[in-house]
Curated annotation (Swiss-Prot):
This protein's GO CC annotations: cytoplasm
Gene name linked to the record: murD
Record flagged with keyword Transferase: no
One annotated GO molecular function: ATP binding
Enzyme class: ligase
Protein name per its UniProtKB record: UDP-N-acetylmuramoylalanine--D-glutamate ligase
Location of this chain's protein in the cell: Cytoplasm
Species annotation: Leptospira borgpetersenii serovar Hardjo-bovis (strain JB197)
Catalyzed reactions per annotation: UDP-N-acetyl-alpha-D-muramoyl-L-alanine + D-glutamate + ATP = UDP-N-acetyl-alpha-D-muramoyl-L-alanyl-D-glutamate + ADP + phosphate + H(+)
Pathway(s) of this molecule: Cell wall biogenesis; peptidoglycan biosynthesis
The protein's role, per its UniProt record: Cell wall formation. Catalyzes the addition of glutamate to the nucleotide precursor UDP-N-acetylmuramoyl-L-alanine (UMA).
UniProt entry keywords in alphabetical sequence: ATP-binding, Cell cycle, Cell division, Cell shape, Cell wall biogenesis/degradation, Cytoplasm, Ligase, Nucleotide-binding, Peptidoglycan synthesis
Family statement: Belongs to the MurCDEF family.
GO annotation (BP), single: peptidoglycan biosynthetic process
Chief location category: cytoplasm
Amino acid sequence: MKFPESLKGLKILVLGGGISGNSALDFLISEEAQPILCDRNQPETISVPFFHDNIDPRSFFEISLIIKSPGILPTHPILSYAVEKKIPVFSEIDLGRFFFKGKIIGITGTDGKSTTTSLVAHLLKKDFSDLKEGGNLGIPFTSFCKEPISLAVLELSSYQLEDSSPLDLNVSVFLNLAPDHLERHETMENYFRAKLKIADLQNPNHSLIVSEKIREKILNSTSVQCKLLSFGRATTSEAILDESSSEIRTSKFIYDISRFYLPGTHNRENLAAAILASEAIGGKPESIQAQIPFFMGLPHRFQIAGEKRGISFINDSKSTNLHSMLAGMSAWKNLDRTCLILGGRPKQEDPKPLYDFLMRGIGCVVLIGEARSVWEKGIRNVIGEKLFSVENLDEAFKIFKKWNVISESPEIRKIRLSSEITISYFVFSPACVSFDQYKNFEERGNHFLSLVEDFLNNASWT
């Protein structure tokens, strides 16, 4: 499907509001199109015609094309009608791609997309001072696609890729693959295929950067026409992660990562991918190296939420599946003194890796939300009385306030649950989506931060 050369005067249906849909609306208005919004919720103020999304699709017989928001299911009746009537359907990313004149780095994967997107943008600041980052990160592509900038760094979800036409990206990054969003994609193969669309239309001048763990799967699944570069610990990788010497080696440079701020092997793998992407787009190794120590990460991704006299709280609200939580906790060295706060609405994942992880000697677990009905029995079978099951975060902090703060020294405190359990670290890494109690993971994380602040300001520290 080809995009129209001009949108002026065209009747275009935006199916689904939200961040990307509303940005597409604003862009279409600026291009003098005649957009129509169709959504389940009517905005309080709107300057274009609005229809509820249960309207008879035949009402849209004069529509030239549809811009579909990523949250809309492919089975929506309006999309079925579009297929029947051969009405072109594009994504908001397609719309931005058609009008953008610069280069694009696209980043996908099950976990680490947002961090790696921001990391790439950070590493390239010196060489591409006008670059912008966006996409699924929360800044819609159409909000800046007509600006005269040289580079866009886009986080691309499986929903966005599934909806998009071939994007012809200069550099694509496929970080990792684990079960996720199967309620939408139904099978792992469908999910993988949606992710793999990031490499569509890439030519020999372009680069596809992948984890060594999925390199063979990709080679066996598609005909790769571009340069395929891998990252990992294997000596055959184009970016070799050597954790013993705190180095990442490429054909162009040996990068010192000893001062890289983010903890965990998964974050160093993200850094290796970001370095390869930065080199592939034209970043100078010396400039990339200079930026590495100054990346502080993103909110709600293993963020220090508060510390006081040796007791620390970690906010990892962005952890929305088991794979993400386990990756983040894999390098944690203080399990026996850690209270892990889990829960929310679990995804369709095998919980056995969670139970295996907890058997390594966790201090205790606080389980909240809908996950209690799914995981409580299994967790209790593993850790027994070290599990505390409560409805929500507020109830969790009520429990924390009842536990005894003990003095190890004038400067150091710990929280004692019993003679066997003493806690120094509270890690909120839910491994679940937030929709049972919150609008999104940001709202959930901000609530956790406010509870931590209240706890640290009001707990007895004598």
